[in-house]
Amino acid sequence: MTNEFTRMTCLVVALCVAMSMAAAPAAKKPAKPLPQPTFDSVVYGAHPMQKMDVWLPEKGAPTPAIIFVHGGGFRNGDRKDPRLGERIPKCRAARVALISVEYRLLKDAGDVKPPVRVCMDDVTAAIRFVRSKAKEWNLDLSRIGLTGSSAGAHAVLYASLTGDNEFGIRAVYTQYPQTSIDPKEMREWIPNSKYGANLFGYPDFQTWLDHRDEVLPWIEKFSPAGLLRRCTPSRAPAFVHDGPAAPKPGELAKDPTHSGTFRVKFSEICAARGISCRFGHHDAFIALLTQDSSKTGKEGK
């Protein structure tokens, strides 16, 4: 009897273990290590976060360069972004340099106001540093592109439009961009918008909206849509956007922070101003950078 009971107990335990293993979600495969950079952890500033990794193609004529800015809501993320794993080989095949930038996050802002300024200042500082390395790294300054997703997309849109495209950026590729960080405009475009208050030091969206007029100069400085409206069309880069479709009329965005409406509204402003903007993928972005400048009308400065 005791042996029978023991066998039954073992069978029940084994069955429970098997069922729990079957019900458990499959573990995510760890991201593959990125290919070894040509230059790892290049320092472009005094803060520990101000570093970049650089992948250069084989020597030859000066090459285009893509500067990648990671996402993460300006709260997390780093330059070792897994999505680079599929982009690095494509860039090498097209003889395009790839530079991945790490930057200070909102938590590193200290007394800086608005907090998002430290993120934007680092991205623009990184671009200046890359430009200063053009001769050493064999880069063609007339063919510099910027790319990022989510918060990184916001950062590269800002960097490509600030100062009337002062860096001479030829093309920008974004995924899931926040093309406006004006709370009033965001609610008009996407009624259930809830992102962005912490960029300006507010605890929630409604408080930010209530105090909008107090921070309007900052909004005008850092919001891509506002910068786009003021940019000289002939100086603007070409834009390639990727991401989900916009919700149907009357429907709320399931993910308002990454709604396709951001992309659509930005494209409408571009169309009204005669600025190149299309829906596309990374390959289309690379093609814009590998064309002769005579075909795009974009010249480096």
Language-model features: locations:
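Alpha/beta-hydrolase active-site loop
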Residues: 114-135
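Mobile cap/lid helix-loop segments that gate and shape the active-site cleft of serine hydrolases
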Residues: 34, 47, 183-230
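Primarily recognizes the serine-hydrolase "nucleophile elbow" in alpha/beta-hydrolase
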Residues: 128-190
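Serine-hydrolase catalytic-loop signature spanning alpha/beta hydrolases and amidase-signature enzymes
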Residues: 73-79, 98, 129
